[in-house]
Amino acid sequence: KETYYTSSELTASRLERLFKNYDTLAVTLNNFRKRKLIVPSSAKKCSLNLSHAIVSKLIVSRNSHAAIDLRDNRFVETLIIGDSFRGSLNFSRSDIQNIKLGNNCRCDIFCIHSGKCFEMTLGDVYSGILDVRDSCFHRIKTGYYCYAVIRLSENWGKKDVIIGDSFRGSLFIDSVLAENVEIGDDCRGRISVREHNRRQGIKHIDIADGFKGEIDLASALALQKVEVGAHAAGSINLSGCPSIQAVKFEEDFSGRVDLRNSGVIYVRAKDGCSGRFVLLHCENLSLLRLPRDKRADIAVERMPQSVGTDSRNFYYHFDEKELPAELSSPFYASWVKKLRHFIHRHFIL
C-alpha cells in the first residue's frame, strides 16, 4: 500500500505514527519543505529517501534504525544523528557541510564525490564502514574506542584527520590531500597511507602515547615527519619512503621501525628506548640521537663520522652537515604536542 501526504499534512505526530507502523518499509519525501526534519526514534528497519527533501537541518533521533539516502540532496546542510543509531547513510553528491554522529552508533557511511566540503565528527564507540572517496572534507574526527573500517581515498581539503583514543579499527588513506593526521592514545589498530604524488599529500603524522598498532607508511610519498608518543610498542614501516626526513619517539619506545632505503635524515628516541631500528641503506641519514643506556637494537651498515654525548644522550653524526632547523625540536615541544592533542580531543568538534 502506498500513501501520499503533502508537506502540511505530514506533521510530526503523523510522521511518528507512520514509523511506528512496522508495515512501513520505505518513506520517500519528495519536495518536502521544512526548515528542520526530525526522524523519530520509532523508525525501525526502514529506508528513508530524502534525496529531494527541501530541509536545511536533519535530526535523526537516538535508537532509530534506518537506511538514510541523501544522495544528490542540495538542501540539507546539517545532519545530526543521535546515540545508538543503526543502519546506513549515503550522502554522495550532496551539499551537506556538517555531520555529527552520537555515541555507540553502528552504521555504514558512504560518500562518493561530495557536493561541498564538509566536517564530520563521529562519537565514541563507532563501528561500521566509513568510505569517503573523491570528496572534500575540512576535518574528520572519531571518538573514543572506534573500531570501524575507515577508507579515505582521493580526497582533498588540506585539513585534518583526527583519530580518537583507543582506536581498534582500520584506517586506509589513499591520495588524501590533508595537512595532518593525528592518532590518539592507546591505538591498537591498523593504519596505512598511500600516495601517488610526491608534491601533494600528508606531510606530518602525530601518534600519541601507548601506540601498539601497525602503521604502513612505505608508500606515503609526501610524508616528511612522524612523531610517536611515550610507551609505544607497535610496528612502523617506512621502508623505501623517499620523502621522510625525521622520525621522533618519546620515552620507552619498545616497538620496531623499518627505515631501510628511505630518505630519513634524523632519528631521535628518548630515555628507556629498547626498540629496534632498521636503518640500512639510508644515504641521507645525518644524525641518530639515542639515550645513553644503549638498550636499543640498531641495524645500520654505515659507521658514524663522530659521536657526541651529553648527560642523557649519544649523538651519532653520519656527516658534517648541520641538521635543518625545522627537524629539531625545542625542549617544550612535547608539552605543546600534548596540549594540542588535548584541545583536539575535548574542544574541537
Task: Spell out what each predicted region is.
Residues E2-S334:
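Extended beta-solenoid/beta-helix repeat architectures
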Residues A333-L349:
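Short hydrophobic helices that act as membrane-entry/anchoring signals
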